[in-house]
Regions:
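Extended, charge-rich alpha-helical interface modules
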Residues: 1-119
């Protein structure tokens, strides 16, 4: 599983969530850089579950920007985390696209966070 808390500012997330996302977000560009990705069946809209990682294969600029915010938030909170920004090196230019977050994306993520925290 790879957690991407789309549209939620890292400053609003609990520390454990920020640290996990910081660690996991780099999986997607690493996968793409190694050529271990397939665009078949890529969802048109953000979702959780099957296909949620594929959704980001052509939105790697969005993930890079999000990663920078996550990294900065970790540092701001006093954590000594490794900077994985180099994971976005060697990404094909056609996959380095941004993404405009939709209100429904945020709703989906907030519901998932609340569900996880209530357990």
């Amino acid at each position: 599983m790879t957690r991407i808390n789309v549209g939620i500012p890292p400053a609003e997330l609990f520390l454990c969530i920020v640290l996990v996302e910081h660690r996991e977000i780099k999986r997607i560009p690493n996968c793409v850089a190694k050529g271990k990705y397939n665009m078949d069946g890529m969802p048109e809209r953000f979702k959780l579950g099957t296909g949620h990682v594929k959704f980001f294969y052509n939105k790697l600029l969005y993930l890079k920007k999000r990663y920078v915010r996550l990294y900065e938030e970790c540092i701001e909170r006093g954590f000594n985390v490794q900077n994985y920004i180099e994971a976005w090196n060697d990404i094909p230019a056609e996959l380095m696209n941004d993404y405009n977050v939709r209100a429904n994306d945020i709703r989906i993520i907030r519901e998932r966070i609340n569900e996880r925290l209530s357990k």
